């Protein structure tokens, strides 16, 4: 029995119609793992950074009609919330598991915080070939860094400084059938490897 990883069946929770029904499916098939990942990586981030990190599993409490198309656990050194801070995420869409670090459009002083990617631009462009950029956390669409020019990357970072809705995340994704999701051991190894890379941009 696995504790941390997700099977193709778990992703199918997003196919369930209706808000209450989908939330029930997420509670049964997805949220238990998110809570386990939350506990595991709270300790990881606290150890790695020297700050006390807190896990925030998405509640989707404001929804009254439309069922969520994704769900996640986020990590930040704030017990009350994470959206205002640069933060880490592990989450799922129907056809994608994502791991991300970056700055949401709701971020406090985001025009200053995003400069960490300017400061470490060489590290950004040196990330392995399966790392990507997300410019909107609400969409599955991500752009492989290897396929972006330096000008495009700089423009994406600058958009956070100049556009209210601008956001920037570095990301790594898996499909629901990826072999690295087959066991807790391989999945946790993949996530830790990814967060090890993301921590280069955390300060």
Curated annotation (Swiss-Prot):
InterPro entries: UPF0637, UPF0637_domain_sf
Name of the protein in question: UPF0637 protein SERP0693
Source species, domain of life: Bacteria
Source organism (scientific name): Staphylococcus epidermidis (strain ATCC 35984 / DSM 28319 / BCRC 17069 / CCUG 31568 / BM 3577 / RP62A)
Coiled-coil residue spans: none
Protein family (similarity comment): Belongs to the UPF0637 family.
């Amino acid at each position: 029995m696995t504790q941390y990883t997700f099977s193709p069946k778990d992703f199918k929770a997003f196919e369930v119609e209706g808000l209450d029904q989908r939330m029930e499916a997420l509670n049964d098939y997805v949220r238990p793992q998110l809570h386990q990942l939350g506990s595991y990586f709270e300790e990881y981030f606290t150890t790695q950074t020297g700050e006390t990190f807190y896990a925030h599993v998405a509640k989707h409490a404001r929804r009254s009609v439309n069922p969520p198309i994704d769900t996640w656990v986020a990590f930040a050194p704030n017990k009350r919330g994470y959206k205002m801070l640069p933060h880490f995420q592990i989450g799922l869409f129907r056809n994608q598991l994502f791991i991300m670090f970056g700055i949401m459009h709701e971020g406090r002083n985001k025009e200053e915080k995003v400069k960490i990617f300017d400061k470490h631009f060489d590290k950004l462009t040196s990330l392995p070939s399966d790392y990507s950029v997300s410019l909107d956390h609400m969409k599955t669409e991500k752009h492989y860094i290897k396929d972006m020019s330096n000008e495009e990357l700089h423009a994406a970072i600058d958009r956070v400084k100049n556009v209210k809705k601008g956001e920037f995340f570095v990301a790594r994704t898996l499909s629901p059938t990826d072999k690295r999701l087959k066991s807790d051991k391989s999945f946790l190894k993949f996530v830790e490897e990814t967060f090890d890379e993301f921590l280069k941009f955390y300060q």
